[in-house]
Curated annotation (Swiss-Prot):
InterPro entries per UniProt: H3K9_Histone-Lys_N-MTase (IPR050973), Post-SET_dom (IPR003616), Pre-SET_dom (IPR007728), SET_dom (IPR001214), SET_dom_sf (IPR046341)
Localization, UniProt: Nucleus; Chromosome
Binding-site residues, Zn(2+) 4: C227, C288, C290, C295
Organism, scientific name: Mus musculus
GO MF entries: histone H3K36 dimethyltransferase activity; histone H3K4 methyltransferase activity; zinc ion binding
Residues annotated to bind Zn(2+) 3: C83, C119, C125, C129
Residue ranges constituting the Pre-SET domain according to the UniProt record: 74-137
EC number: 2.1.1.357
Protein encoded by which gene: Setmar
Keyword Methyltransferase: yes
Reactions that this protein is recorded to catalyse: L-lysyl(36)-[histone H3] + 2 S-adenosyl-L-methionine = N(6),N(6)-dimethyl-L-lysyl(36)-[histone H3] + 2 S-adenosyl-L-homocysteine + 2 H(+)
Protein's UniProt name: Histone-lysine N-methyltransferase SETMAR
């Protein structure tokens, strides 16, 4: 083949690859509601993802104690000076992000026992404030794609540096009774998207947040579990006490790599002996296909959600 032919073939291959991943308005899973379109691949795959109403943010569902769209936090008064710890009311301890918008000290799970608060709509610091990251939405091109064994998954089409915000896990914020009702209506063939986030606060109490993106949700619903995930879920509060479930890169993530987090809420599969006992004694569960060396062979199981109401 001539040099001209090789060059033409290379261009055709490049164009074909670009068409296979390049988002278009017609295939935007996010329906134009995110900063960037989210493509679907392959377009003609069957079965198609189950239909759902797209929302980039939490919405109040049945039984929710607080409407996540209500603004309940006061704003900071940082007008002439940048938001820094000690002077900004939103940064009581230390900066949440560095100059590159990366979450600080990613990789230390214990580090994020502390709360993360961003500046909100009532703050006087402006939208260019460094303490506004999660609220600014997607910054990397993502794609919903069909996996070999796990159904639909989510991957990145761009390099994502360690510590950068990737996406939220958004959906209906539910009360516990509604969670139990929905759980008991599920069949063995249904996917469970409901996530329970439990935060231990200084008074010894536990704050619970239940989010279900089954019917109303965002691209976070396509994230699969991994026992060695590349994402870390952090509750981030902006306008109210209802946290945004923000997913950050736990390491550098290469283009084409599937995005995943640990459904159990742990990170890097740090299983305590007590948790291991719960896993061994739990009823039959769905197999895990993450392929990690530390794979527990089954998807995490939260028995508290399956208790009789």
């Amino acid at each position: 083949m001539s040099a001209e032919g090789v060059e033409k073939l290379s261009l055709e291959i490049a164009a074909s690859e670009e068409e296979s991943v390049a988002p278009t308005e017609q295939q935007d899973v996010a329906c134009g509601l995110e900063n960037l379109p989210v493509s679907l691949w392959p377009l003609g795959a069957e079965p198609r993802p189950k239909p759902f109403q797209y929302t980039p943010d939490h919405v109040a569902g049945p039984g929710a104690d607080i409407d996540p769209t209500q603004i309940t936090f006061p704003g900071c008064a940082c007008i002439e000076t940048p938001c820094v710890p000690g002077t900004c009311s939103c940064l009581r301890h230390e900066n949440n992000y560095d100059d590159n918008l990366c979450l600080r000290d990613v990789g230390s799970e214990g580090k994020y026992a502390k709360p993360v608060f961003e500046c909100n709509v009532l703050c006087q610091c402006g939208m260019r404030c460094r303490n506004r990251v999660v609220q600014n939405g997607l910054h990397f091109l993502l794609q919903v794609f069909q996996t070999e064994k796990k159904g639909w998954g989510l991957r990145t089409l761009e390099f994502i540096p360690k510590g950068r915000f990737v996406c939220e896990y958004a959906g209906e914020v539910l009360g516990f009774s509604e969670v139990q009702r929905r759980i008991h209506l599920q069949t063995s063939h249904d996917s469970n998207y409901i996530i329970a986030v439990r935060e231990h606060i200084y008074s010894g109490q536990i704050m619970e947040t239940f989010v279900d993106p089954t019917y109303i949700g965002n691209i976070g619903r396509f994230l699969n579990h991994s026992c060695e995930p590349n994402l870390l879920m952090i509750p981030v509060r902006i306008d109210s006490m209802v946290p945004k479930l923000a997913l950050f890169a736990a390491k550098d993530i290469l283009p084409g790599e599937e995005l995943s987090y640990d459904y159990s809420g742990r990170f890097l599969n740090q299983v305590s002996s007590k948790d291991k006992e719960k896993i061994d004694c739990s009823p039959p569960r769905k197999p895990c296909y993450c392929g990690a060396q530390s794979c527990t062979t089954f998807l995490p199981y939260d028995s508290s959600l399956y208790m009789a109401p």
